[in-house]
From Swiss-Prot:
GO terms for biological process: cholesterol homeostasis; cholesterol transport; lipoprotein metabolic process; peptidyl-methionine modification; positive regulation of interleukin-8 production; positive regulation of phagocytosis; protein oxidation; protein stabilization. One of its GO terms (molecular function) is lipid binding. This is Apolipoprotein A-II. The modification Methionine sulfoxide is found at M26. Apo A-II makes up about 20% of the protein of the HDL (high density lipoprotein) phospholipid-rich fraction in plasma. It comes from Macaca mulatta (Rhesus macaque). Its main location: secreted. Monomer. Interacts with NAXE and NDRG1. The keyword Secreted applies.
Length: 77
């Protein structure tokens, strides 16, 4: 069986895709001023979103782990 990608791996892949898209977009833009604004926007967005996405990933893993632990505990009678 193939391993499923981790939340961190998916988040990293998402940010890499967004970064690549931003770089491609900046190459298509000819105005240096517009390029600088776009670069600043992407950097600021990444800076602000990274902690939120990491926390959401951690919270999701903890939430799912709770249910896995419930299933593995023997039922008390």
């Amino acid at each position: 069986q193939a391993e499923e990608p981790s939340v961190e791996s998916l988040v990293s892949q998402y940010f890499q895709t967004v970064t690549d898209y931003g770089k491609d977009l900046m190459e298509k833009v000819k105005s240096p001023e517009l390029q600088a604004q776009a670069k600043a926007y992407f950097e600021k967005s990444k800076e602000q979103l990274t902690p939120l996405v990491k926390k959401a990933g951690t919270d999701l893993v903890n939430f799912l782990s709770y249910f896995v632990e419930l299933r593995t505990q023997p039922a008390t009678q």
